[in-house]
């Protein structure tokens, strides 16, 4: 199976303060600088499973861009670079429970519609370029014109809880006609404009709006729910003894594992196959949340190229 991923690649600065931030003060912290980005995270996790993957992303020829290119090449990810004037940076502020709050300086993915491999077996699109007003409309049109043999998954992009941006994103998703739509619970609430009460209800409500898609709503330790295409499933989260350290990239790991498990199977998947895929995705997402960094390696993943 070959996968093309359209999405961001960023330099991540992960900050774990030793205590509450003090306005005007100085708080000791653990700070890690590493490769990240929703699109790159998915691509790297897929490559570590031995899947041929191509990443369409925007990188500049600056120090950060050179670092990220080298890291992706070591992971075996084929790059189709959209040359940018700067490389995106994300600061992830991690609280005492491992939950992250992000401060982002993302770079629009201008021109991605001319680079994506529409003949891939599976095409995955990060939500950030689809939500961006500079790239979203052209990208949605390109995705909607893909080959009928290419499966498309679309992820959320930290949707703003405001009616305007969420409605625009929903329209672009509808134009892209994804086979699989992946949203966090907060993203699902923004997408619908209201909290439907449960993940299962959220997934069902979104599936009614996107009748050609299988919709998955995830909530980390709260599990996940799927609806659409005649399927309706709820899966518990994987339970690990170790505490969560950094949730950054856990959802991207979930997406990568789900694609790896479902790719090559008949569509829509059988309920049993989807249940197994959701369990495997939850397991990888949980393990990634127990390490620091969105692309930090976990047990069982292939080592990078020398």
Predicted features by range, described:
Residues 3-4, 167, 195-306:
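Conserved phosphate-binding/catalytic region of the ribokinase-like
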Residues 26, 30-37, 63, 86, ...:
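Residues at secondary-structure transition points
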Residues 1-56, 66-70, 244:
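Glycine-rich phosphate/adenosyl-contacting loop at the front of the ribokinase-like
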Residues 1-9, 70-82, 94-234:
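Ribokinase/PfkB-type carbohydrate-kinase core domain
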Residues 46, 184, 251:
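Short, conserved phosphate/pyrophosphate- and ester-handling motifs at nucleotide-, phospho-/glycolipid
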